[in-house]
């Protein structure tokens, strides 16, 4: 049986699984869908065309599914889609998409979103991502799986953050971070490969060694980006465990629109 506090407001039309818990003074809008075993904290607002999967925990005073902070927005029925097993802590704000993009903001599975984080319209957050307290994502930001964003960091709109990368606290990021790379500073600069994170996630010694070699090619050998990409493609075909991650690195660089941090 759904446990809804008597002070909570659940508007007609909301689709709420019978195992959901909704705390005091929370508000759930008419176009919201909430999956099994999800908990909605007190005073939080779940609005817009928002879908929450299963086993999510929404903290107190979170605002999920709000209108995009985009002056072009004209009340189109854009969406927010959140997967399963996410923790979204207190005072976090996550906005729906805009029609200028694909119209959907997405958050995958198993993410840890700490207090006061902002995820702007049209962001695409993957799986197993950590966004530390007060990290701020502008619109259209893309974050790959297992990325970690330090607290008090700001990320410019349309920036892409590669899988398994890490952005240090209080950083300002205005260009893309390639996968596997650590970055920090204002503005953020590269500081090596995320070796410890890769070890924890089961990357082999050969794969990590190949990524270290790729990092030297990209950042330490004095090459232009185009020259570096030629050598990176050679590394990606060397054979062994390092081929796939180095290939992923090259593909990310090739797809970059804002350019990568250098």
Curated annotation (Swiss-Prot):
Pfam family, one: Hexapep
GO cellular component annotations of the record: cytoplasm; membrane
InterPro entries, sorted: Acetyltransf_C, Acetyltransf_C_sf, Hexapep, Lipid_A_LpxA, Trimer_LpxA-like_sf
Keywords: Acyltransferase, Cytoplasm, Lipid A biosynthesis, Lipid biosynthesis, Lipid metabolism, Repeat, Transferase
Locations listed in the record: Cytoplasm
Pathway(s) the chain acts in: Glycolipid biosynthesis; lipid IV(A) biosynthesis; lipid IV(A) from (3R)-3-hydroxytetradecanoyl-[acyl-carrier-protein] and UDP-N-acetyl-alpha-D-glucosamine: step 1/6
EC category name: transferase
HAMAP family, per the entry: LpxA (MF_00387)
UniProt-recorded name of the protein: Acyl-[acyl-carrier-protein]--UDP-N-acetylglucosamine O-acyltransferase
Protein's organism: Burkholderia cenocepacia (strain ATCC BAA-245 / DSM 16553 / LMG 16656 / NCTC 13227 / J2315 / CF5610) (Burkholderia cepacia (strain J2315))
